[in-house]
Amino acid sequence: MPRLWYSRYLAAARLRCRPLLIPEQPAVRLYQPLRRTVNTDANVHRPNEFVPLRKQLKEEAKRAKSQSRNGRGKKQVAANDGWELTVGIEIHAQLNSEAKLFSKAPTSTVAEPNTNVALFDLAFPGSQPEFQAATLLPALRAAIALNCDIQHTSRFDRKHYFYQDQPAGYQITQYYEPFARNGFIELHDYDGIAPEDGKSVRVDIKQIQLEQDTAKSHEHPPSAHFLDFNRVSHPLIEIITMPQIHSPATAAACVKKIQAILQATSAVTTGMELGGLRADVNVSVRRRDAPPGAGEYYGVQGLGQRTEIKNLSSFKAVEDAIIAERDRQIRVLESGGTVEVETRGWSIGSTETRKLRSKEGEVDYRYMPDPDLKPLVIDDGLVSALKDTLPALPDQLLSMLIGSSYGLSLEDAKPLVELDDGARLEYYQDVVDALLALRHGEDGDTANKLLGRAAANWVLHELGALHTKSDVTWHADRISAQTLAELIDQLLRKKITSSVAKQVLAMIFEGDQRPIHQLLEEENLLLRPLSRDEYIALANSLIEENPQMVAQIREKNQLGKIGWFVGQMMRLGEKGRVEAQRAEEIVRKLILGGQ
């Protein structure tokens, strides 16, 4: 069975160019998605039940929000009729590097403020930028994974502006000659794209460029701002998509998919949820039945006038901000107004974007080549080595999980890939490997699928439920993969029942250190199967006591009530001796006969 995990990148050892001293990169981890739960039950509060005031207010707020959302959705559908939305995205991601881009100071997100600072980071007179070669590796991995053409030669430019977080008065970037061009990303229906986009949609990537981050500002009311220069010159990549997206949901799915790819390749530090990635979106609208608009950017003509929304920090913010700006522009145009060229902002929970400033153009930033930095020359051997060692990407992982080796459904495969920054998938793989070792005599696709599905059920649902109930984050050491595999093996060999397996799992989760076999023996939990006559006697006693329910099953075909009889048999029978499947067979035979 193929391994899905790559723990280290050792590309430097395979280079045909001059060796670089590159710090060892951490293990690949996929991201943990943000999850949204919408309460659709209109009858949450029941007058006959006591509900604490705090809970009642919370539930009423949920209902009001849901109703507002539903109403807004209908309004949007009506307002959007006859209009075409176009969106382009710019994603800024902090690279996973121990070195800064242009100084020898280390990077850190937890160090004391202003402790990881070099003279160049503070723009001391006479200090010079020193490009750190190690920062290039995560950037190249990201560009390769996003199907970009790596440029043999690229150059750095200065982007001039004056603000407190940039002491030099300019940012070093790659505006004119970036290191990667002409990439693309494929989005599928399971990524969450809009239904009108069909099964899949391709979004082209114009370029990916290296650039330096700015200082971090800490506001201290009423009027002070503290600056932490640890973040200055932290290496960033800016990923610029073409304006080819036409729905808010697909735009959010695009950002989410790009983040997943960046984290799968260990190219970035963290995702949006921890501030390691942020997005700007360019939004424009035009009437579908009108002549092409005068707007143009990145070579795409006929667009409406665009605005840019800056610093969106979640997938939901991307979607909601685009919806709000689309509707605002439509209202402006329908009232006879003109959409202004400007930069706008968005706050979580808002219903409208807000103007920040008139949008700067190329002339405003006064881009010019940086005279202190040589051209960046990337050897083909380095690119080839990184391609050869690139780990499996999210789509590839999904294909392997739902393929013949594991046989999972898409509904189970996606959470394994997405949850817990990739730790759940790694743990699942360890459980499957341990199961294969325990059942080494069984081989073939059928056995693999059986073990793969069983492991997924227990890793995702049973063990996942215990973490959720205890309100703790996922931790693989809570129950070792070997221990869970042994428990599943006992269940598959019918040495214990499913209810006993869940009981044992909970005991170990709460700290029981006994080995599985010892725990089962000492707690007298091993299955001692009932005979057929014992099953029949137990079922008959329940059938005789519940003639009305039997009639409903026979006459009204209410087969779901068979499960009630099974549950009662497991409750009334001696602990650990009643198997649900066997009990259901007996109940069906006695009530339905030959049916």
From Swiss-Prot:
Alphabetically ordered keywords of this record: ATP-binding, Ligase, Mitochondrion, Nucleotide-binding, Protein biosynthesis, Transit peptide
Domain of life of the source: Eukaryota
Transit peptide feature range: 1-72
EC number per UniProt: 6.3.5.-
Catalytic activity: L-glutamyl-tRNA(Gln) + L-glutamine + ATP + H2O = L-glutaminyl-tRNA(Gln) + L-glutamate + ADP + phosphate + H(+)
Record localization: Mitochondrion
UniProt keyword annotation of Amino-acid biosynthesis present: no
One GO BP: mitochondrial translation
Functional description taken from the UniProt entry: Allows the formation of correctly charged Gln-tRNA(Gln) through the transamidation of misacylated Glu-tRNA(Gln) in the mitochondria. The reaction takes place in the presence of glutamine and ATP through an activated gamma-phospho-Glu-tRNA(Gln).
Family, as annotated: Belongs to the GatB/GatE family. GatB subfamily.
Oligomeric form and interacting partners: Subunit of the heterotrimeric GatCAB amidotransferase (AdT) complex, composed of A, B and C subunits.
Alphabetical list of PANTHER family matching this protein: GLUTAMYL-TRNA GLN AMIDOTRANSFERASE SUBUNIT B MITOCHONDRIAL AND PROKARYOTIC PET112-RELATED (PTHR11659), GLUTAMYL-TRNA(GLN) AMIDOTRANSFERASE SUBUNIT B, MITOCHONDRIAL (PTHR11659:SF0)
Protein name: Glutamyl-tRNA(Gln) amidotransferase subunit B, mitochondrial
Source organism (scientific name): Talaromyces marneffei (strain ATCC 18224 / CBS 334.59 / QM 7333) (Penicillium marneffei)
